[in-house]
Design a protein with these regions (language model features):
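Glycine- and charge-rich intrinsically disordered segments
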Residues: 1-30
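Conserved RNA-binding domains used in RNP assembly and mRNA/RNA metabolism
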Residues: 24-126
């Protein structure tokens, strides 16, 4: 059986929970920085992040390369932080001036070291 003090406690918890759900956290996206972007279906990209809409998950990219295949890093996190140890084995596409990608899953800022290595990878074409 519920006593009135328990009911009030439950109500306060519910109210606090709902208030916390309604608070929106403001994210600072690395606009203007070189990033690696992973999408749900379009793949992985290296680019300058021009804009990002968190509600639609659409990222606008500038000077963009598709990362088709890489070796020399175990993950995109390592690639963004350290670059690749095997640049000759990587398949990075030609640059595209502007691109929009949907269903963005990850935006990983690149370190200066990684930028230098990634931009040194030769363009892969067939």
């Amino acid at each position: 059986m519920c006593v009135p003090s328990q009911v009030r406690q439950i109500d306060k918890t519910t109210i606090n929970f709902n208030i916390n759900l309604n608070k929106q956290k403001t994210m600072n996206y690395p606009i203007g920085k070189r990033v690696i972007v992973r999408t749900n279906r379009a793949g992985v990209f290296y680019a300058t992040l021009s804009d990002f809409d968190a509600q639609t998950r659409i990222a606008e990219l500038k000077d963009c390369r598709r990362i088709h295949y890489w070796e020399g890093a175990c993950s995109l996190s390592q690639l963004a932080e350290e670059g690749t140890k095997n640049p000759d084995s990587c398949r990075f596409s030609m640059y595209v001036p502007v691109m929009q990608v949907m269903e963005t899953i990850e935006i990983i800022p690149c370190s200066d070291k990684a930028i230098k290595i990634i931009e040194g990878v030769e363009i892969w074409k067939k």
